[in-house]
Structures are given as structure tokens and as C-alpha cells.
Amino acid sequence: MKTIIELITDEIKNVFTECGYDEAYAKVTVSNRPDLCEFQCNGAMAAAKAYKKAPFMIADEVVAKLTDNKMFSKIESVKPGFININICEDYLAGYLNEMSETEKFGYFNADKEKTVIVDYGGANAAKPLHVGHLRSAVIGESVKRINTFAGNKTIGDVHLGDWGLQMGLIIEELRDRKPELPYFDGSFTGEYPEEAPFTISELEEIYPAASAKSKEDAAFAERAHEATLKLQSGDKACRAIWHHIMKVSKADLKKNYDNLNVHFDLWKGESDAQPYIDVMVNKMIADGIAYESQGATVVDIQQEGDTKELPPCIVRKSDGAALYATSDLATIVEREKLYHPDTYIYLADKRQELHFTQVFRTAKKAGIVAPDADMRFVGFGTMNGKDGKPFKTRSGGVMRLEHLIADIDEAVYEKIMSNRTVEETEARDTAKIVGLAALKYGDLSNQASKDYVFDIERFSSFEGNTGPYILYTIVRIKSILNKYTENGGSTDNLKITAATEESEKNLSLSLIKFADIIDGAYKDNAPHKICQFIYEVSNAFNGFYHNNKILSEPDEAKKASYIALISLTKSILEQCIDLLAIECPDRM
């Protein structure tokens, strides 16, 4: 199904061609002056230079051939050469009916199906999720869902940090606390216990204690470094403890990500890439791609046209150790072998841009991926407190993500209880859904690369561009539709008819943008575009709701059209919030 912009453009193109002008000038956009018109074409301005004519003459010529076109209720030329367009209400109603009957409301991605790896989450084993993990999780989940909606085979990978020094620190701290465990008995030859020697709460306390100790105790730090090397070299006891750490940590991380409505297809980590590293680096050396510099093994990534000097990618340190770049490159080797992706999308703090530039260029230069491989980095900004600095607890520490969620749930709960008469249990359940929407929408409504201020009072408000406002709009529509069916009405086979007043047409005009918005969000990895759209639709619906008595409309044909229109509105809003991984309660 073509978008409304494409359909209007087709009509304008035909006339530009008929008048002897290149159809490329017939570009139509949504009007940036909705007080003047609904759509516009500024092509006559550009065509004037090519054809050495006054732009208004070209615009007049085109408009003259379109005045009787049934697609338009008004089309006019405005000096110096703009073409202003309003769409016919009957045509608009027909388009909306086709949307409601078409899969994905008419959205269609013309590209062939791709296999897309979305690398997001960024969690570390043995560490709790904190507020710094929020953006990668919620933006990544939305990008993954948008890609799936676009028809791609999408694979989301949490890519755990599970192979670094934190493992050695935990192993040695555990040795100091529980030296009697068989892992620390050099003469032990039996099977190690299946039960982990710690709980998740103990594990989360062990790591920071060990990290602090390593800063003050050089001998302990050296032991931790040695334990890390032993783990990475395959030591049986260290590997057994590591497996316990991973089992306990993954279970807790899955629970916390589930609470965020974030779900991964793969739970792989840096450890999975380790078997590929030596072969990969040695091949780079043999192929003349990598060379030794100051004891380290590096790959030059500078390219002609770069406006600044870029440092080489270090793939092996002077002591033989691998780095994050090495692990990320080896992960690409594994992904190429197992999944054959067409596209890679990585989500991380925008300050990691150089790192991913190095990794992508090295992967292409070394032949790990094709030279024209589609590799994208979506860098996000920081979630800040009201002081404009990275969000902290009141005591200045890093806040755990589950505590942040609890805080916003409580804020929403208090608003529900103060404004409505509702049972506490229902209020708590509703607050959990709405609170998560407040948190996620507050993040996703910002362009990913921008920093934003976390304001619990604003995010939890039921007014303005917020998650609760969007959900309240959907719940309001659900309530109207429920009352309609309870009174004997049926929503089956209802048709939208031509709008008869402004707010009705405004809602219709907002809904027809759906396919264009989804296409833009998909191509730009930009969930905030969906947020902008659903806020516009919600405002348009509420304007329509306040201007019209939907259920008490005496004209039955008009009432049926209203019900069909708001049913489509609800369906589109629900589809959009699902792409943001936001759920909606039945009542609020």
C-alpha cells in the first residue's frame, strides 16, 4: 500500500511531466504551515532555475491541470511559487478504510528480508543493572522490534561483559572468605559442587568489596590478575567458579530485564569470542593488516577523506592480552560464522564512537566482513539529574535500575490514588505498568544521541508529552468502545466516512502518517520519531473527543464512522507502543 505522500506525489509527477518538467521536482511533503494547507510542493521554485521561468508561472501551470482532481479539496499556487494542497475528505476516508483492512496498516518495507544483529544491553556479569544501563536496554529493544516489524529476521544479543578482571577479583575474594571450598584445594580431584557457593545478593556484595580491596592491596590485585589469566587459560577450578557466577548472574539479569519488558534472543558474552581471537589476530599479521607498534599489535584505520587523525586499533597488548576491540572483532567472526548477518546495529554510549569506528574499519580491512558491510553505531547520550550531571542517588552513588523503577512506580501510584477512587491492589498493578511506560517513554521520546534530564515529576504526569498521557488516551478509547459494545453496538465492518468538522479531519490526517513515520524510525534507528507521532495522534484524538459527543451522536451513520475512526486510532497507538516495548492497562 502506497503512503498518502506517495499517492499525492504520483498525481503531481504526472502533471509536471505533462507540462514538460522533470518529475523529480514534484516532491510533496507534509505542510510546515498547517494553518495554510495540509501538504505542499515547492518543486516549482527549484524548477524555475532549470527552465528559466518564474516559479509562480510553473506552479500556476501545474495547478491549472489539477483543479478538478478528486483527490484534492483545494490546490492552489501561492507566490513566489509554492503549491498548497488540501486532501479531499472522501479520499481521506477511503484511504483510512484501506489502512484498517491492510496488514500493518499499509506499512510495507520494499527491501528484501535481512538478518539483523542488534547488540544492546551492555550488562556485566556479577554486577547489578544501574541507571546507566537503561538507555541501551530500552532504545535497543525498540530498535529490535522496529526491525522485526519491518520484516527482518532480527537477533538481539545482550553481549555480556563476562570475561574480564571482575572475575578474577570475585574468585580471589571468595578464596579469602571461604578458603575451605574445594575450588581452592589444590589436591582436590573430584567433581565440583553443582550448587553455587553464593547467592545473587552475596555476589553483588562480593564484587564491590573485592574491587575496593584491589585498590588498596597490591598483592590482592596481583592475585586477581593471575586468577583472571588462569580462568582465561582454562583452569578447571576457576572455570567452575566462573560457571557459578554466570548461572547466578544471568538468572538475576533476566529477571531485571523482564521487568523492563526487554528480551534478548542471545545471552552470549565476551567469553564466547575467546576461541576465535588467536586465529583472527595471527591471520591479520600474516595478511600484513596488523603490525607491531611499541610492543602492541595494531591495525591502521585511517582513510582518505578523514578530517582528523584516528588512532590505530590495538588488537593485542604488549603483554599478549586482548582488549575490548579484540573481543568485539572476534565476536563478529563468530556472528559471521553462525548467523551471516546483513546488518549489525550496536547501541552504546556515544562516547564509544571512536571504539566502534576502529572495530568496524578493522573488520572490513581484515576481511571479517565485506568492505561494504552494513555496520551501524547508535550512540546515545546521558540520562542526567536536574543538576545537569549524570543521574545519581541522593548520597551521590550510582542508582540501581530496580530502585529507579520502584521510585517512579511509587510516584505514579500516588497520583492514581489522589485522583481516582480505586482499590489499592489495582492501583499498584496499574502503577507498575504506567510507571514503566513513564520511564521508557521519558527516555525514548528524546533523540537517542541527546542527553536528557530525568524528571520523575514530569515523566509521571498524566498531561503533556509523557507515557502516562499516551496510555490514558488509549484507555479512554478502550472505555468508549467498551460502552459502545455494551449498549449493543458492534465494531465489525464499520466504515469511516468523510470528516465533517476540523478536529475529525485533523485526527484522520495524523493517522495517515503512520507508514511514513515507521519507515523513518526504521531507516534512522530512531524510536523518538514514533514517540512524536503517537503524541500527535493522542493530541488529535483528544481534540476530536472534546469536540464531539461520540456515543450520544444522534446520527447513527456518523456515530458508526466515529467508532470506526477511533477503533483505528486505538489499533495504531497500540501497535506503536508495542514497538516501544510499552504495555497498556485496561483501566487507569
Predicted feature residues:
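Non-catalytic interaction-recognition regions
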Residues: 1-93, 105, 110-588
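Short, charged, solvent-exposed linker or helix-capping segments at domain edges/interfaces
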Residues: 94-99
